[in-house]
Amino acid sequence: MIKKSLFILAGFSFPFYAGATSFASNVTGGTVTSNLSMTVKASCSATVGDVAFGDQAAGNIKKGSVADKIMSLAIACDTTMANYTLTFTAADGVKDLANGIINTKLNSTVGYQLKWGDSTVKPVDTAITVNGTAITPTNKPTAASFTIPIKVKPVALGEVVSPGAANTALNIKLTFN
């Protein structure tokens, strides 16, 4: 049996800015120009839970028969944000960028595959890019609070799956713009 759990660490960045607005009015004798600068400060919180698979048979991981689990990134703001980006980095490195597979800390034979759980960000079941590049979602938020589901699954990184812990961390940077 392989004992593993996926621990997720999330780093969030929330800069919010609205650009300056300028207007000009023609009046007798000259032009009056006024400038209005505005900074919008919205409050947001984001949470993500740990994902634990418990003990799994090495053969099941090798066959790919361990079921996906959903890791939910829950975002709650006091207003609907216009747009956002997500950036993912893996604490223990990336094994297969094209398929969204990250390494684990102490077990080089097991990794985790990350896929989108629905079409909130990108098409469902497409691999998540874990390389520090900002991902702009396909769909903009339509509510102040929303959830982004991410499918997580342990996968074999070769022909042999060794018993032991298979822990890792995923860093998520969420930027609203």
Regions picked out by a protein language model, each given a short descriptive name:
Residues 5-13:
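Sec-dependent N-terminal signal peptides
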Residues 13-19:
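N-terminal signal peptide c-region/cleavage motif recognized by signal peptidases
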Residues 19-177:
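Mature extracellular/passenger domains of Gram-negative fimbrial/pilin and adhesin proteins
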